[in-house]
Amino acid sequence: MMDGIRIDVLSVIPGFFDSVLDNGLLAIARKKGYADIVVHNLHDYGLGRYRQVDDSPFGGGAGMVLRPEPVFACVEKLQSERCYDAVIFPTPDARPFLQGDANRLSRMKNLMFLCGHYKALDERVRQSLVTMEYSIGDVVLSGGEIPSLLMMDALLRVVPGVLGDSESALTDSFQTGMLDCAYYTRPPEFRGMKVPEVLLSGHHAKIEQWRQENALERTRRLRPDLLGEDVE
């Protein structure tokens, strides 16, 4: 393949990724050679006859904790094969993952995503192996698989050549610090709802002005925090 991004994903449920990697943008990025995504089963590095990867937390309490040994074994094996720019752990107790983060990650060559599961990940893994932590929002999921896919999609769509129209990614929401404007397509009128006349005018300067004004209005109404304004 061409000199694309190598992404290794560590998970206790690797089959979760099968359908997603074979469809949509991630499949396109792989087919075009812009990404090489490999999923690793942490159970292959588990302990004992039953390949144990979790255990109860010290101090008691509900839930199970992902043990350090399988994670260290898998990460260190991969690190012996290549140098990683980042070992990423999606977790709700981290700063938000933003568009700027996706842009930065898209310029890296070797990334590793560590998908947590169960109640928690042993803290020693986070202290010793993880180099970046991101939250996708104030919500708790059953594992890091969905957040990892979200981040992979976000970073790969801004890699030049992945999308059919690279300019499309550059005009997305947040790329300019605001939400994107509204979009319309055919027909020009549907069930009494009309497309704004300016978009049908063919006057490019006026269309661009409308889009900027619409984006500003939508941002002020939906995400005033992006403009530094108070949120009601």
Swiss-Prot record:
GO MF entries: tRNA (guanine(37)-N1)-methyltransferase activity
Enzyme Commission code(s) on record: 2.1.1.228
InterPro entries (alphabetical): Alpha/beta_knot_MTases (IPR029028), tRNA_m1G_MeTrfase_C_sf (IPR023148), tRNA_m1G_MeTrfase_TrmD (IPR002649), tRNA_m1G_MTases_N (IPR029026), tRNA_MeTrfase_TRMD/TRM10 (IPR016009)
Main subcellular location: cytoplasm
Chain sites annotated for binding S-adenosyl-L-methionine: 116
GO CC terms in record: cytosol
GO process annotations (BP): tRNA N1-guanine methylation
Source organism, top-level taxon: Bacteria
Record key words, sorted: Cytoplasm, Methyltransferase, S-adenosyl-L-methionine, Transferase, tRNA processing
Catalysed conversion reaction: guanosine(37) in tRNA + S-adenosyl-L-methionine = N(1)-methylguanosine(37) in tRNA + S-adenosyl-L-homocysteine + H(+)
Major enzyme class: transferase
Location of this chain's protein in the cell: Cytoplasm
Pfam families, A to Z: tRNA_m1G_MT
NCBIfam families: PRK00026.1, trmD
PANTHER family cross-referenced by the UniProt entry: TRNA (GUANINE-N(1)-)-METHYLTRANSFERASE
Subunit relationships: Homodimer.
Described purpose of this protein according to its UniProt entry: Specifically methylates guanosine-37 in various tRNAs.
Similarity field: Belongs to the RNA methyltransferase TrmD family.
Protein name as it appears in the record: tRNA (guanine-N(1)-)-methyltransferase
Species name: Chlorobium luteolum (strain DSM 273 / BCRC 81028 / 2530) (Pelodictyon luteolum)
